[in-house]
């Protein structure tokens, strides 16, 4: 981590933590309070459609890039998202990602090689979502948008999630607050190195 941070500062790069999230039409379950003997109920039709989002957040500024996707995540859709981010930025991008198959596929290796002039990829250790600050953003969006709600119409779910995502895209300071604990831990690692 200290070397990645130094490299990002030296290149004046965006240091982006990436991940994907899925938002279910039937809502997200959570703990809640209710009077004894009166458990809360959320209506559902059994529809199992989900709304998926690719996301990247910048370690330094909280800038948030995202793209919705209605199909399954795959190398092609991930490459399209990264191309969108490359087209929106001028800086070098250092992307820290998990080991999802479509992140590490042969097609993505070719993509990364093709764009190595502006794109550096770093892998998170296996099974370590706790090292990825964007997880806090997904948790917050799920709590604000679909939690304990059922959306009879898929466009209603999309609108609710998009509203929450747009809010965070317009207020990067809120993202830096969400990331603060992780960034503080990462900063301590840098100072100790």
Which role fits each region the language model picked out?
Residues 1-83, 182, 186-192:
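Extended, low-complexity cationic-aromatic segments
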Residues 11-15, 134-193:
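C-terminal anion-handling pockets and recognition modules
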